[in-house]
Amino acid sequence: MERKNWFNKEIEEIEKELKTHRENGLTQEQVKQIREQKGYNELQAGKKKSLFQRFLDQFKDFSIIILIIAAVVSGVVGVQQGNGITDTIIILIVVLVNAIIGVAQESKAEKSLEALQKLSDHASKVIRDGNMQVVPAKELVPGDLVVLDTGDYIPADLRIVEEVNLKSQESSLTGESVPVEKTSEIIEETEIGIGDRKNMLFSSSLVTYGRGKGIVVETGMTTEVGKIAGMINSTEKQETPLQQKLNKLGKTLGIAALIICVVIFVVGLIQGKEPIQMFMTAVSLAVAAIPEGLAAVSTIVLAIGVQKMVKKNAIVKRLPAVETLGSSTVICSDKTGTLTQNKMTVEKVFWNDAIRDLSNIQEDEIDKELKKLVYANMLCNDTKISQDGTLTGDPTETALVDMAFNLNFDPSIYDRTPRVQEIPFDSDRKLMTTVNEMNGKYVVFTKGGIDELLKRCSAYEINNEVHQNINEHVNQIREKNEEMAKDALRVLGCAYKEIDHIPSKEEMKQIENDLIFIGMVGMIDPPREEAKVAVEKCKTAGIKVVMITGDHKITATAIAKKLGILENDDEAITGAELEKMTDEELAQNVRKYSVYARVSPEHKVRIVNAWQKNGEVVAMTGDGVNDSPALKKADIGCAMGIVGTDVAKEAADVILTDDNFATVVSAVEEGRRIYDNILKVIQFLLSSNVGEIIVLFFATLLTPLFSKWFGITDINSLEILLPIHILWINLVTDSLPALSLAFDPANSDIMERKPVKPGKGVFTKGMTWRVIYQGIMIGGLTLAAFMIGLGTTKIPINGLTLDQSKIEVGQTMAFVTLALSELTHVFNVRNNKKSIFKTGIFNNMKLIGAVVISALLVFVILWIPGLREIFSIPVLPTENIVELVCLVLAPIVIVEIFKLFKINGGEE
């Protein structure tokens, strides 16, 4: 699409190109013809997934597919053998519950475009055929002449043809918090950012001051906001690091399960076992190899994290986003309102030839000159003060009134000094003047830009003395002005003079002459104190903080230095400089820069993409329409809840309800805690499952030996664990403790370690070692329990005869030991370095409760006769209780020894 620089064209040229007129607009016939060509002034929505499609997405995980296959096969075999489909139903219920939770917790249908369309639902005043009329904004076409007043939404991209003191709020597009002064003059430069196109008005912005007319030059998807809509549509969400790791884990487990099943099936056939029996054993192994509860538990752990994050002022829309925050290696943050207070504040005051910090001025230091300076800023000011003290008006002007209140000036000054005349601010003069009645006299107060103000001053008041020749002081005043400007302060000067009567309109034209200069104030949108602490916390945690703003470079670098984001000026770059780089060059150099100023929405997306190309997990904060594509492109998008636009909120994964950068860092910390806890869940479930696999594997491979030792003639009769035992332990007994690990508190050093590398899988060396040796431990204890239940601990055994009752006692001992030893083992996984006696057993009471309930569920099977029959479990002999207790507590003793000798794998 050809890019047209409307700001770079004369009005006459635009009239000719669009066949319109700056006074009469288009004709109705022209409007009809143009609409047929260009369509309506509205935004196009992107494709959305249906509820059914999102439901089906939940079944793409490889381990879930294996479970479904196992469930179907188990059901077919169960029906053929007359055993029913209990196992199938249990597996399918778990899979279904996981899918429902996933869909319920995902964000609702993407509404970014719907929110954008709401911006164009307003009515607009337009001149057609020379007559003013009101039409829906969507009916505007290029060439229409739009009339705008204070408070009007701008319905399309307009080239200004007429303006009177016109200002517009473009922060949602540019990120700049201060309203932009507009002009109708041509701009000679050809390559400038949106924020510098002073003769243009942009769709979705707001007229905050003055009035004007503009010719519609772009509508719908060709407006600046439309281009953003197009970027939102074309931006696809990537899988989160956790999703990638769990998918990889699922595939690994699925392949491992298939290999084990094939090996067991073939070995069993070689041994002469029944094919159907071996098929069911293989299915049992598949069920044992894949932790059925992992997907559901991981989902619920994330959901619990979502609830905890709400209390920390972060609303999570997309469930996996919780963990992604914890994996973040780069945070790209908007400046205004996130890193700063989004409130212009006077920081420095210049009077009596000295610059002072406002916060250090004591009440007894307020002399005659400072009073005049403050009065000038209060009275030459259009800020409105409500009964409850709320200030409304231009941010610059409210900052000046706020300064007066901070110095304890009495608001009654407004009643005692009524305004009798004024000259409003305009962009040509860069000044505002009022005439106020004060103590029976009339005082002229003027404030504005230093250069323009000094031209109109003839004297300078210092230390209660008026120096009639200001030229002697001009250089020093300018130096002080530059000193404040270098700190990125917006500087306004003030002057006054006394007159003896209310000036007429003619006299007002010359009133801004022979003024007495009294001082200057410097203001800025200051950084949040908590943001500085948060940035330092990020550095310690190995997270790079990058400022991306539509504001000017000098302001951005000053704020970034105060926050500790930037050390040297060469770490800052502008959008114009960025525009000259290719994507490859940006990706190569992106680590050099910490501040990006005067950037466009396209630039923000490119910056995020450059970091992602470097293998980083990027979190992005923003509040405006201009931030939306980058919010969606980032691995995790965080929108502001207070000042954020609907568009930004819909494009984001997380909404910060307090608009605070510190909340992002708190959310990162919470994300790390959740990620740690999910790893604990994985370690717990996998080590338990490895134990189950070992038991089944050994039972199959060693059946001939057992048969020889025990004199069993039926090779199919010896099973240590039944499929229903495995299902009960995996789905019921283990799930509650695994779920309760979600409530484990964060380790004290959680924000002192580097982020987990994005490409790093779950199976690190340490994790693999722990899963294997702890699985062997649980499997070995279960086999030992089986032997004890048989009535012997000696191998080999000669001359021992076994009947079915002894086998059932052995199975019961194995089942109870496996279930309860896994419950004690859950305490081992809470910290892989520190002893459980140092980390504390009772600092997660939900885990204690879950272990107690799960243990009771095991005993319920032992105690209730009907359930004993279903599970083929006899009453447990009392003589085995002591051995059982020792076996159940053994995991804690063994792992504590491994931790003591530092062979447990440690944290990674």
Task: For each feature predicted by the language model, list its residue ranges.
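A C-terminal functional module that forms or caps the active site or interfaces directly
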Residues: 829
